[in-house]
Amino acid sequence: MSDLAPHELRILVAVEQEQGFTAAAARLGMTQSAVSHAVRSCERKLGAVLFDRGRHGARATDAGARAVTYARRILRLLEVMGPEVRGAGAGDAAGEVTGPLRIVAFRSVAAHLLPPVLARLTARHPGLTPQVRIVRELGRGAAGEVADGRADLGLATLDDSAPPPVPGLLAVRLFEESYALVHPQGHPAPRGLPLVDWDENCGSYTRDWWGRQDWIPPATIDVEDDSVAVSLVSQGLGMAIMPRTALLGAPDGLAVTGLGPRPPTRFVGYVTTPELAGTAPVRALIRELRALALPEGLERV
């Protein structure tokens, strides 16, 4: 099997992202026939059909999706290789860290914990350019984005079991947070209120506890965002059971009540690839994450 060249990897990524040869060609400044020829060449080299062609465009096959994942990760390593080598050659004396840093995180962490981290990070390393995307913690979540080569580091919920959420990644816990009952302030019986819930709320870390609570009713309102759930509770539409990070910056008129001596908890940490874990931008971000002063209700682990 012949090796794929970097330009071929870029073509595979573009075709997968644009879901078609014509759009990929326009993005890359190439002709459609050149892109089609390059994809056929990649398929011959790899011995697999990478894209299903049709009127719908070009959709990655299972083999193609795997190839594109490797392509993204290899291209990212090529991108960071120059700065890493130059830093090593200079003895890293200046501590200069430059270039893009791709971060994915779920909403509450991105909104409340990342800003001070990135403020310190960019103050120390002005040449660093963080790029932050919000990813819902459903399915493979932030870890899947890292595994697929779309992000350098993800801030994710980590189960109480040791293995990372996606095989092949490095996963490190940063803190543990408890869940609490949030309800309108002054309500005499908040546990009797209707339940407002959101679909990222119940992972394996809460499911067992939730199942043992006979006082929790079925959800009256289901939403897709924890901030919407908090807003609905603030308007008197019910109560919610939420992790502490989701309650940071909550509006006035809310009360937060503990769930007993052994409330459900979850771990939050970072995931990255073994290859990127040692790069200067990722190391710099991890240092700032570890130095973050945690709000009340979050305990470092």
Residue ranges and their predicted role:
Residues 102-104, 177-182, 186-206, 293:
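Short loop->beta-strand "edge-of-pocket" segments that line small-molecule binding or catalytic clefts
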Residues 137-142, 147-150, 157, 201-257:
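Hydrophobic hinge/microswitch elements
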Residues 187-189, 237, 257-301:
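A late-sequence structural motif
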Residues 98-163:
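Central regulatory/effector-binding core of bacterial HTH transcription factors
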Residues 13-31:
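Short helix-boundary/capping micro-motifs
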Residues 157, 191-218, 235, 278-286, ...:
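Secondary-structure junction motif
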Residues 163-173, 177, 228-277:
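Beta-alpha-beta core module
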Residues 21, 43-62:
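A short LG(V/I)-centered, amphipathic sequence patch enriched
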